[in-house]
Swiss-Prot record:
Zn(2+) 1 binds at residues 70, 72, 85, 88. Transmembrane segments: none annotated. Mg(2+) binds at residues 460, 462, 464. The RNAP catalytic core consists of 2 alpha, 1 beta, 1 beta' and 1 omega subunit. When a sigma factor is associated with the core the holoenzyme is formed, which can initiate transcription. GO terms for biological process: DNA-templated transcription. Zn(2+) 2 binds at residues 814, 888, 895, 898. Its EC number is 2.7.7.6. This is DNA-directed RNA polymerase subunit beta'. Binds 1 Mg(2+) ion per subunit. Signal peptide: none annotated. It catalyses: RNA(n) + a ribonucleoside 5'-triphosphate = RNA(n+1) + diphosphate. GO terms for cellular component: DNA-directed RNA polymerase complex.
């Protein structure tokens, strides 16, 4: 029977394809798809339920309703296959064809396609060079359009109203031709000469110089060239034939009760057909023009609604007043075709259940409930039952399984053996959210999960559910086992730290075991080996924490690399000695000989992984877990009220704080401080008091008094349960303990401001009603924040994945020697991230040379692993140039050397690894841990931030950076006059140890090359004011400084001294008052000039400056001329957390961005305009560049100052686009990486830099053509970098001029939408716009990325899929070569083709042959 069925199966050929092209369909093409014209709007007969003939469900056009059965029932059964019934006209075939056969409607009047009309920018408008408004008037029959002017002075494409048309007709008769409606538009499109238009436009482009015009022309040129290249005729944008979707894709389903549920499309099609038929009839009847016009307009509207309902005018609604879902709505949005069905599918062979903990499991196992396994593995069980002869048919087997015969369970055990299943916990934020395990059958209905993988899944056992999936094919099982098994994924791909780190009970147990206790039972006993310790412990002679001495066996490698046992004596504790049993060999006992806190255990597992390999580490982690659980149980640690010790000093501290607050209140009431200052001070006092109570409490908790062996009183670390839990990292933190036993402290109001009365009680004492009420707000806000955060974080991840999804490692080495120099990250003199952490796992770009001996220590192209990084540290290299994804020269994808180590595997990255997606997941996954709020810096918060001096942290020599400029004043002090001055401290080897920024006007207390001790002051400054320092000496001459006009006199009430303050000038009668400034005059009465130029020194003062010199006063170099109070700086909102990360990746320009100098040159000020000041920079060639700066901005430079290109000249946050333009890609990358890292570092999240670099590479993947040279581009066009480089290679090979370009920084959303793959862009956002554009350009999608391939249903070109695609392409090339060779043999006299082609192809490996490495 089966063989018989196979005979009748139609041969469905698997189409192999390499690209998908999208275009416009010509009317002929649409007719060729069609199986017949739909003439009637009827659907099915309401009595017989049979489809009406020529209707929307017609069986003649679309195929039979039942398999192999015509409609009237004359032909049934397979034997009539392919017969067309003469009675009802239906072909006898499978009913499945109703899903693929299309019909068509011949439109009585042409109709413009709404996408090309209304999708902005309007493509029709661009081609015709008319405004959208005009085209709409023509299309919807409100105006006439001249098609052929003939001999008249009218222009082609001119728009005329009805009255105009009548007037012109009277004037010229029928010398000209004008039409209205889609016919007019179609005629215009048909008669357009694209080649000529392109020529003219190219000519205009060369001739014009106005920016706006160039932009406009190049846009139009691009569209026209698209038509030219793709061979699509513009008049196809107007349809004469409308295709009809196959009926099974717009089904009509009978509901019970004789009603029908139908797809909205049927309604929309019915309207089109009705109006079209009416129009046909009117045309036959030769109805008056005005009626026809109305009918044509209605037809146009009906077709518009079918294609994209609601795009123009009011949306068509059904009977129940809801908008009908049109064809465009079917594909776009979250529930559209792309995101609902193509990118996310539901899968068979899956189940979900609650998870419980399975501490007895090994790391690679999970507990699967028997009933679930029975259901999931049904087909395998059926197969097995048949093979064993226990069941003859599937049906019988089904019966056996359903009755749950004992034999079935045995078979289930067999089937499940070595068959991994995949577990997934939603939300799957990174690749560790799905892992494979070997199932172990268990009773019950809950899945058991190994405790160590919880961190990776972010799972807990408070009711979480997980889904199980079964990989079916052998290949799938193999991949699940080798790539996804939990024991093969022990490192986080985000940062290379172990992911199987014990937590909570396990940590507590291990910590409790490895602590020491002074004077424990049996202290100081010597033991021969661990077994003896175990006996003594079992007999109660010693406690776990007793200090003892014991002989332990360790394993070390000898010269031959064999393991040799070594016995050493260690002073340790009983617990540690017993734990030493589980150490893998290769780790010395010293790693265990300390109290194991969570960080220590993580480091221990990391060390084990690097030294002993994966297998031993997994076994070790499992044993650690078992011991931890056992010991925590044995330890019997619990919490009691008594453990929360309230510090005795609490009352004293609170009383003291209360007194200080009263004092401040008194000052306020006598008017000495303002209310704002009083509030700030009060908040400050209570904040400090809270910290003091917390400190006192921790001191009391952390230690306890004991008597040691010699009878002395000593303090030891406490065994208080709460303290142990926090200290070990098992649960809780100092801040939480402070609320339990200290005081709760200050609370925030709903608007974010701090309530000035703190909660002085703690949870042990209990809160009163008011205190409880105050604290409710904060608790609720936390919950609301979390919900918002999750959604935002998910959206950020989606955008990141979308922009990087096509980035895959495609080759081993691109051969570049470019890279970025890495140094240790230093901020405020402290090393935040040492050099070793930054270069670990990267590849050296150039040889690394020992600074002392000048010998090459590490050659270029070496992967820097732990040992090499240690070597670099030892040798004393402080700057290493490493390869980075940003400088990789691979065209599509990345090379393995530029990426470096695969952090999730700990080895060199493999070709085919989807590093883009991994980067996106690594950045998006911790997103939910980031905060959502915007911080207001001001008041109490900023006071702590005011520094007024820098000190060295280490001994060394001072070195001034090249940017550091200073003058020496009369007292011999050095005064800094550079904006970006830096000062470094070098150690004896000349390595930079620390680096400090020195602000403008600071007094530098050390000289270049001075030796300093740690703690030396380097520079001091006044934190509250910013000085203006004179760089030259002379007598002061005031200009434009008039009291009451530009300055005001302020008298200090306390001291009686008066100062001049610069105010906003009052303009009198339109006379513009110059800005107040001073010139310096030398002894001869001439203006002092700036050294090396003939500019006079003039120093202008900003509004709010306090002038400290008098007119005519002699000033020396380095003297302060004026001070600008810093209080006047407004409180800035600092965007933090998730919004800040999104802002950086979207490359948004900040609201009031700072300005960077466009050129290197000298600053001067021009004439001010209204509300703006004019700043001029004269470059070295003497060309001046002007900038207008709003008055309220703070200018950081003054007259005569020399600035470097890219230096800050106006205060404010930096704009990434400016950084890219003025300082280049490297600076931009550093800026984005550092800023993103700052946000994550604040939350204690570790992410490797290279992930952020990968994203930045994708943001920089487009370039802007400035000069096309001889290449095939348009000026101002944005193209993919790889496309540009390929084109330039081609042009250079022909000895022509390559195109010049600028780098462009795109935000991640923009970058995703501007990708070359239209499928990927359409499935991301703005589907209609993307598809419209792609169709006109006749775009071809080469299916390079992962997303496109998922959508078309192929294996993705990453991992094992990449190998598959490469092999497939090789095979195709080989077959082509063989065909070519065969053709040559058959016809030897034909001209020989170029031999090179064939040679290249034949040198590919043949089947069964492996390519030589």
């Amino acid at each position: 029977m089966k063989a018989l069925l196979d005979l009748f199966k139609q041969v469905s050929q698997d189409e192999q394809f390499d690209a998908i092209k999208i275009g416009l369909a010509s009317p002929e093409k649409i007719r060729s798809w069609s199986y017949g014209e739909v003439r009637k709007p009827e659907t099915i007969n309401y009595r017989t339920f049979k489809p009406e003939r020529d209707g929307l469900f017609c069986a003649k056009i679309f195929g039979p309703i039942k398999d192999y059965e015509c409609l009237c029932g004359k032909y049934k059964r397979l034997k009539h296959r392919g017969v067309i019934c003469e009675k009802c006209g239906v072909e006898v075939t499978v009913a499945k064809v109703r899903r693929e056969r299309m019909g068509h409607i011949e439109l009585a009047s042409p109709v413009a396609h709404i996408w090309f009309l209304k999708s902005l920018p309007s493509r029709l408008g661009m081609v015709l060079d008319m405004t959208l408004r005009d085209i709409e008037r023509v299309l919807y029959f409100e105006a006439w359009c001249v098609i052929e002017p003939g001999m008249t002075p009218l222009k082609r494409g001119q728009i005329m109203s009805d009255d105009d048309f009548l007037a012109k007709t009277e004037e010229y008769g029928d010398d000209f031709r004008a039409l209205m409606g889609a016919e007019a538009v179609r005629e215009l499109l048909r008669t357009i000469d694209i080649d000529r238009e392109v020529e003219t436009l190219r000519g205009e482009l060369k001739a014009t110089s106005s920016e706006a015009k160039i932009k406009k022309i190049s846009k139009r040129l691009k569209v026209l060239e698209g038509f030219q290249k793709s061979g699509i005729k513009p008049d196809w944008m107007v349809m004469e034939v409308l295709p009809v979707l196959p009926p099974d894709l717009r089904p009509l389903v009978p509901l019970d009760g004789g009603r029908f549920a139908t797809s909205d499309l049927n309604d929309l099609y019915r309207r089109v057909i009705n109006r079209n038929n009416r129009l046909k009839r009117l045309l036959e009847l030769k109805a008056p023009e005005i009626i026809l016009r109305n009918e044509k307009r209605m037809l146009q509207e009906a077709v518009d609604s079918l294609l994209d309902n609601g795009r123009r005018g009011k949306a068509m609604t059904g009977a129940n007043k809801r908008q009908l879902k049109s064809l465009a709505d079917m594909i776009k949005g979250k529930s559209g075709r792309f995101r609902q069905n193509l990118l996310g599918k539901r899968v068979d062979y899956s189940g979900r259940s609650v998870i419980v903990v399975g501490p007895q499991l090994k790391l690679h196992q999970c507990g699967l409930p028997k009933l679930m396994a029975l259901e999931l593995f049904k087909p395998f069980i059926f197969n097995r039952l048949e093979m064993m002869g226990l069941a003859t048919t599937i049906k019988a087997a089904k019966k056996l399984v359903e009755s749950q015969e004992p034999v079935v369970w045995d078979i289930l055990e067999e089937v499940i053996r070595e068959h991994p299943v995949m577990l997934n916990r939603a939300p799957t934020l990174h690749r560790l959210g799905i892992q494979a395990f070997e199932p172990v059958l268990i009773e019950g209905k809950a899945i058991q999960l190994h405790p160590l993988v919880c961190a990776a899944f972010n799972a807990d056992f408070d009711g979480d559910q997980m889904a199980v999936h079964v990989p079916l094919s052998l290949e799938a099982q193999l991949e699940a086992r080798t790539l996804m098994l939990a024991s093969n994924n022990v490192l986080f791909p985000a940062n290379g730290e172990p992911s199987i780190v014990p937590s909570q009970d396990i940590v507590l147990g291990l910590y409790y075991t490895t602590r020491e206790r002074i004077n424990g039972r049996g202290e100081g006993i010597f033991f021969a080996d661990v077994a003896e310790v175990q006996r003594a412990y079992d007999n109660g002679e010693v406690e776990l924490q007793t200090r003892i001495t014991v002989r332990l066996k360790e394993h070390e490698r000898d010269e031959q690399g064999e393991w040799q046992p070594v016995i050493r004596r260690h002073e340790t504790t009983v617990g540690r000695a017993l734990l030493s049993e589980i150490l893998p060999r290769g780790l010395p006992f010293t790693v265990l000989n300390k109290a194991l806190k969570k960080k220590e255990i993580s480091r221990l597992i990391n060390q084990s992984f690097r030294r002993c390999g994966l297998r031993d580490t997994v076994i070790f982690a499992d044993k650690l877990m078992q011991s931890g659980f056992r010991l925590a149980t044995r330890g019997g640690i619990s919490i009691a009220m008594e453990d929360m010790l309230i510090p005795a000093a609490k009352e004293v501290i609170l009383a003291e704080a209360g007194r200080e607050v009263k004092e401040i209140d008194k000052q306020y009431s006598s008017g000495l401080v303002t209310s704002q200052e009083r509030y700030n001070n009060v908040v400050d006092i209570w904040g400090k008091a809270g910290d003091k109570v917390g400190k006192a409490m921790m001191e009391q908790l952390a230690t306890e008094p004991v008597v040691n062996r010699h009878g002395e009183n000593v303090r030891q670390e406490s065994f208080n349960s709460i303290y142990m839990m926090a200290d070990s990292g098992a649960r809780g933190s100092a801040a939480q303990i402070r609320q339990l036993a200290g005081m709760r402290g200050l609370m925030a109001k709903p608007d974010g401001s701090i309530i000035e009365t703190p909660i002085t009680a703690n949870f042990r004492e209990g809160l009163n009603v008011l205190q409880y009420f105050i604290s409710t707000h904060g608790a609720r806000k936390g919950l609301a924040d979390t919900a918002l955060k999750t959604a935002n974080s998910g959206y950020l991840t989606r955008r990141l994945v979308d922009v990087t999804q096509d980035l895959v490692i495609t080759e081993v080495d691109c051969g570049t020697s470019h890279g970025y120099s890495m140094k240790a990250l230093v901020e405020g003199g402290e090393v935040i991230e040492p050099l070793r952490d930054r270069i670990l796992g990267r590849v050296a770009a150039v040889d690394i040379v020992n600074p002392d001996t000048q010998e090459t220590e590490i050659t270029a192209g070496t992967l820097l692993d732990e040992d090499l990084v240690d070597l670099i540290d030892r040798v004393g290299v402080d700057e290493v140039k490493v390869r980075t994804p940003l400088t990789c020269e691979t065209r599509h994808g990345l090379c393995a050397h530029c990426y470096g180590r695969d952090l999730g595997r700990g080895s060199h990255v493999n070709v085919g690894e989807a590093v883009g997606v991994i980067a996106a997941q690594s950045i998006g996954e911790p997103g939910t841990q980031l905060t959502m709020r915007t911080f207001h810096i001001g008041g109490a918060a900023s006071r702590s931030a005011l520094a007024s001096a820098v000190e060295t942290k280490s001994n060394g020599t001072v070195g001034f950076a090249s940017t550091m400029r200073y003058v020496t004043n009369a007292k011999g002090e050095r005064v800094a006059i550079s904006r970006s001055g830096e000062l470094a401290i070098y150690d004896d080897n000349g390595r930079e140890r620390e680096r400090h920024k020195i602000p403008y006007g600071a007094t530098v207390l050390v000289g270049d090359g001075d030796a300093v001790k740690a703690g030396t002051r380097l520079a001091t400054w006044d934190p509250l004011t910013r000085p203006i320092v004179s760089e030259y000496g002379g007598a002061v001459r005031f200009e434009n400084i008039e009291e009451g006009v530009t300055v005001a006199k302020q008298v200090d009430e306390v001291t009686g001294l008066s100062t001049l303050v610069v105010i906003t000038p009052k303009t009198r009668g339109g006379k513009v008052v110059m800005r107040p400034q001073i010139k310096l005059v030398n002894d001869n009465g001439e203006d002092v000039r700036i050294a090396g130029t003939d500019h006079a020194v003039n120093i202008s003062f900003p509004v709010g400056a306090l002038i400290t010199v008098r007119d005519g006063q002699q000033v020396a170099v380095g003297e302060v001329l004026a001070r600008i109070p810093q209080e006047s700086q407004k409180t800035r909102d600092i965007t933090g957390g998730l919004p800040r990360v999104a802002e950086l990746f979207e490359a948004r320009s900040p609201k009031d961005a700072g300005m960077l100098a466009e050129v290197t040159g000298t600053v001067s000020f021009g004439k001010d305009t209204k509300g703006k000041q004019r700043l001029v920079i004269t470059d070295l060639e003497g060309i001046s560049h002007e900038f207008l700066i709003p008055k309220e901005k703070q200018v950081l430079v003054h007259d005569g100052q020399v600035v470097n290109k890219g230096e800050m000249i106006v205060d404010g946050p930096a704009d990434p686009h400016d950084i890219l333009r003025l300082q280049g890609i490297e600076k931009l990358a550093t800026y984005i990486v550092d800023e993103v890292q700052d946000v994550y570092r604040l939350q204690g999240v570790k992410i490797n830099d290279k992930h952020i670099e990968v994203i930045v590479r994708q943001m920089l993947r487009r370039v802007n053509i400035t000069d096309p040279g001889d290449a095939d581009f348009i000026p101002g066009e944005q193209v993919e970098r790889s496309e540009l480089l390929n084109e330039n290679d081609r042009v250079i090979a022909e000895d022509k001029r390559p195109a010049q370009y600028d780098n462009v920084l795109l935000g991640i959303t923009k970058a995703s939408l501007s990708t070359d793959s239209f499928i990927s862009a359409a499935s991301f956002q703005e589907t209609t716009r993307v598809l419209t554009e792609a169709a006109i350009m006749g775009k071809r999608d080469d299916l390079r990325g992962l997303k496109e391939n998922v959508i078309v249903g192929r294996l993705i070109p990453a991992g094992t899929g990449l190998a598959y695609h490469l092999a497939r392409k090789d095979k195709e090339a080989l077959e082509a070569a063989e065909r070519e060779a065969a053709r040559q043999q058959a016809n030897p006299f034909e001209e020989m083709p170029v031999a090179a082609d064939i040679e290249v192809d034949v040198s590919l490996p043949f089947e069964g042959e492996t390519p030589a490495e």
